Amino acid sequence: MPHYQNVPFEVPSSWVWCKLEDYVKSVTDGDHQAPPKSDIGIPFLVISDVAKGKLNFLNTRFVPQEYYEKISFDRKPEKGDLLFTVTGSYGIVVPVNIDCKFCFQRHIGLIKTLNTSEYLLHLLKSSYIKGQCDEFATGTAQKTVGLETLRSFLLPIPPFAEQQRIVIEIEKWFSLIELIEGGKDDLQTTIKQAKSKILDLAIHGKLVPQDPNDEPAIELLKRINPDFTPCDNGHYTQLLNGWTVAPMQVL
C-alpha cells in the first residue's frame, strides 16, 4: 500500500490502494448547461432514468444530433463504462451494458473504465463507498458528491485474477439471494394455500382422528339451544358420525 499513509482498512499484501482517478480513464459528468430539446435525436437521461440501477429509455427526452456531436469524448458513454449519480439520490451505480448513443444531465457522473468494470461496479455499490459519499457530500436542499471528491475516493484493488474470482463469487451469492427473494411470492402463495387446506380439512373432520367416544355434536347443539331442531341432512351425505349441521344463529 505504497503512498497512502492512512488507509481505511487493511487489505492483503498483494492488493493496493489507489484513487478512483488513478484506476480509470476519466471521471466526468454531464453538460452543466440546459441542453436543447428535440422530438427526435439522441436520448438524454436524467436521474429518474437510472434510479433503479439500470438504464431506462422508456420516457427519456431527446437532444439534437448536432448537440451530441459537440460533446467531448470523455462525456459520451460507451459500453463498459459506469454511471454514478452525484446529486440528490447520489451513489447509484449503473453499468452501461448496451452499445447505444446517449447523453445525460450534470447530476450523473461518467466513469470511463480502462479494463473490465465488474469488480469496480461491485466496489462502487458497496457500503464502504456509500459511507464516503455520505461523509463528503455537500449542500443542503440537494446533497452533492463533487467530481473532485469522487475522483479522490480510495479504492482497495486486488490483483486482476483475484478480481475475477471475487466477481464470480459475488454473483454466485447474489444469484442465490435473488432466488430467495423471487421465491417470497411463491412462498406466500404456498402458505396461504396451506392455511386454506388446513381449514378445509378441519371443517371436513379430517384434521384430527375421530374418537367414537366423543359426544355427538347434536347433543352440544341441544345444550346450546334446547329448541334446536336438526336439519334435514340429505344434502350433506359426507358428514361424519357424531357431526351435525346447524344454522349460524343457533351457535
Task: Provide a role label for each language-model segment.
Residues 105, 142, 163-164:
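Glutamine-centric residue-chemistry signal
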Residues 46-47, 65-125, 146:
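A short beta-sheet element
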Residues 2-29, 152, 156, 164, ...:
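Non-catalytic DNA-recognition/assembly elements of restriction-modification systems
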Residues 34, 126-155:
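Specificity-determining recognition surfaces
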Residues 16-53, 70-72, 90, 244-251:
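Low-complexity, Lys/Gly-biased intrinsically disordered segments
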Residues 1, 8, 173-221:
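Short amphipathic coiled-coil heptad-repeat segments
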Residues 49-63, 97-98:
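Short, basic/aromatic beta-hairpin or loop at an interaction surface
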Residues 9, 31-32, 70-71, 139, ...:
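Short, solvent-exposed loop/turn positions at domain surfaces
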